[in-house]
Design a protein with these regions (language model features):
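Regulatory cytosolic signal-relay segments
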Residues: 1-47
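A broad, low-specificity signal for short, low-complexity segments enriched in glycine/proline
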Residues: 2-17, 65-67, 108-112, 145, ...
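N-terminal short leaders/motifs
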Residues: 5, 50-52, 135-140
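N-terminal start-of-chain detector that recognizes signal peptides
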Residues: 21-27, 45-46, 76-78, 118-123, ...
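Short charge-dense sequence patches
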Residues: 23-39, 68-83, 129-137, 152
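Short, functional N-terminal and low-complexity linear motifs
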Residues: 27-30, 48-53, 72, 90-96, ...
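Catalytic NTP-binding/metal-coordinating core of nucleotidyl cyclase/transferase enzymes
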Residues: 38-117
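Catalytic beta-strand-to-alpha-helix segment of the class III nucleotidyl cyclase homology domain
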Residues: 111-205
Length: 205
């Protein structure tokens, strides 16, 4: 997020710290579905059940070492562009984040069919990489190998940043995203899903 200079005020800093720390535990509610971001303040939060999907390129250092910067830009732009497009196709996508060559999304999945649709997103991404690699191969560019990880569970949704500055972000705390990232680390080796997701998908009646 873009930022500009602002003098630090120690007194106001203490006031902001006290305002957050004195907040009541009741301000952090449990939700089965992701609430509106308009409901978030700097002093509340929501413990939400949802799904995370994490995609990351394997061996990106070798790709970076092989190609010129313009070629790298083309490879990454096409990869990221179409991952975002596919994730947005989920009817209940809530957030998409891009960090380097990693793209991850949060999905509101209160019902079984919503979770099934997240699996479909993963399948489409896998197919997309196959198509993209055909096009990269024709240009003698490095082909991409990616890991895909998915997790279902609880995440603490908060609004974090500097109050009044316009610099703030929605942050997803807890193990949900890191668990999806860990599963992504096994990418292109085998399919792995979390125990809670297995129960949701295969043990419901």
């Amino acid at each position: 997020m873009k930022a500009s200079y602002s003098a630090y005020d120690f007194t106001k800093s203490r006031e902001r710290i006290d305002e957050i720390l004195k907040g009541a535990d009741a301000d952090y509610q449990n939700k089965d579905s992701i609430p509106s971001r308009d409901d978030l303040t700097f002093t509340n939060g929501f413990n939400v059940r949802c799904s995370a999907l994490f995609v990351d390129i394997r061996g990106s250092k070798a790709i970076n070492d092989k190609h010129t910067k313009p070629v790298l830009a083309k490879i990454y732009k096409t990869y990221i562009s179409e991952l975002v497009a596919i994730m947005r196709n989920h009817p209940k996508v809530n957030e998409i984040s891009i960090e380097g060559d990693c793209v991850w999304g949060i999905f509101d999945t209160p019902y079984q069919i919503d979770i099934d649709d997240v699996f479909e997103v993963a399948y489409r991404i896998s197919s997309l990489i196959d198509v993209l690699n055909i096009k990269l191969r024709k240009r003698n560019y490095s082909e991409l190998t990616v890991g895909i990880g998915a997790s279902y569970g609880s995440s603490l949704l908060i609004k974090s940043g500097y109050k009044g500055s316009g610099i703030n972000e929605v942050v997803w705390l807890g193990t949900l995203v890191s668990e999806a990232a860990k599963l992504c680390g096994y990418g292109n080796k085998l399919w792995l899903i979390t125990k809670s997701w297995f129960r949701m998908c295969f043990m419901t009646t």
